[in-house]
Every structure is written in C-alpha cells, then in structure tokens.
Amino acid sequence: MGQKIHPTGFRLAVSRNWASRWYANNNNFAAMLQEDIGVREYLKKKLKNASVGRVVIERPAKNARITIFSSRPGVVIGKKGEDIELLKSELQKRMGVPVHVNIEEIRKPETDAQLIADSITQQLERRIMFRRAMKRAMQNAMRLGAQGIKIMSAGRLNGIEIARTEWYREGRVPLHTLRADIDYATSEAKTTYGIIGVKVWVYKGDTLGRNDAPVVEEVAEEKRPRRNARPGGDRRPRRDGEGGGPAGARRGAPRRAGGAGGDGKTGE
C-alpha cells in the first residue's frame, strides 16, 4: 500500500519528524491542533509571495517557537525586521502565549516539493500549459540533485469538459522504502474552469544521518524469567559420556543375550 498511503505519515518516527512537536493531554489536544491549523493557514495567506516550504511549531513551557522555512527569507523579515515584528505580534494574539519566530532559508527551492507544487499551480493560474510547467519543474529538480521526481495533475486540464489525471516521472521514486527520503506536497490551482490539484513526490536519497530524522535509542533487551523455571537456574551443560544415548534407551547394566527365539533365559 505504499502507492496509496501518505508518504510523510508512512515515515513518521522512522525517517521523518512531525511538523507540530508538542505534547498535550486529552482536554487540550483538539484545541491546540486546531490552533496549529489556523496558524499555518494564516502564514500561508500572509506569506504567499515569500515561497514558504513548511512551518514547524513547537510549544516548550508556556510559549511557542515557530520555524518558517522559506527560499526568500528577506521577504519574510522585511526592511529592518519590521514585517517579522508585525508577524510575531499577530501570532501572539492568535496563540495567547509568547511566540519566537525563526526563519530558515531553503538552499535549493527547485528540489522542495511544496515550492514545486506552488510554482506549478501559479503557472496554471496564468494559463501556461500544464505539460510544459510539469516537465520544466522536473528538469530543474533533476539538474539540482534530486534522484527522482513524480508530478501528478488532476482536473479540467487545458479546460476540457471531462476531468482527467496526468502524471510524469523521472528517476526513481521508491514509495515502499521507509528509509527513502520522499518529500511530498500538494497544491491547488483555482482556474476559471475549476480547481486543478497538483501532487509532487521528490526522492532525495536515503535518510541515513538526516538531521530532522527522529533518533530512537535502542534499549538492551533484558532476559525475562520463564514460567515454571528451575529453582537452581538453568541446567548445566552435559559432558561427554554422561547421560548420553538415544531417546528411549534403557539406563543401567547391558542386556544379556537370550536364546534363539527364547524368552531371554539360558538353558541349564
């Protein structure tokens, strides 16, 4: 089922980490999760021109830390940091706790799945041919180090009356391999004919030694006592010549040879 399941959820705690990293009890969990969704929607609308790839939200000790990954950090920060201060004050009103905002730059936006999907949807809204937009994005990703990429578009492509799905793939995209670093994202293009959905899978190699992969400590397995164990512990190893012989053999003195067809008694 690797072809159908969400690639990020399939790899959580194995080779990918969560986008919301906090703990809450049952009473507060739903409210905090809804708050995270609202913050992400607000940032997506507010920073539409800043090429935001993903947003990581952490909640340590009655405050919040939000990390914004963007290929254009200057647009997020603004002149002399004015825009980021306004953004921080708005986020504090929404979340009700002190908020620290960090900006991380995406070095290769051509290999980031979310930025690729957003770029394709923007081109579709400008009436650019979907095949040209998809193939150009695939060429740029492969040129800058991606080992494989797959792009799927679905909807009324080129304004046709019957919706259809088209996809292209270049390189390897191993969806069943858990250690494979698969970057997955979706986006929607709102055209005059309706919505066109775009999905992007980018294979960047294996996640051995990746920084954001969760580290699982291996605990040494303790030897559990068996039920009805011997009081003195396990049986000591058997030495040669002691208690040997095939199963069912009689122990003690060797059996005397009897007469032919007799009952084992010798004649007197």
From Swiss-Prot:
Pfam families: KH_2 (PF07650), Ribosomal_S3_C (PF00189). GO terms for biological process: translation. InterPro entries: KH_dom, KH_dom-like_a/b, KH_dom_type_2, KH_sf_prok-type, Ribosomal_S3_C_sf, Ribosomal_uS3_bac-typ, Ribosomal_uS3_C, Ribosomal_uS3_CS. Residues 39-107 form the KH type-2 domain. GO terms for molecular function: mRNA binding; rRNA binding; structural constituent of ribosome. Residues 232-242 have a biased composition (Basic and acidic residues). SMART domains: KH. Keywords: Ribonucleoprotein, Ribosomal protein, RNA-binding, rRNA-binding. The keyword Cell cycle does not apply. Residues 216-268 are annotated as: Disordered. GO terms for cellular component: cytosolic small ribosomal subunit. Binds the lower part of the 30S subunit head. Binds mRNA in the 70S ribosome, positioning it for translation. Belongs to the universal ribosomal protein uS3 family. This is Small ribosomal subunit protein uS3. It comes from Paraburkholderia phytofirmans (strain DSM 17436 / LMG 22146 / PsJN) (Burkholderia phytofirmans).
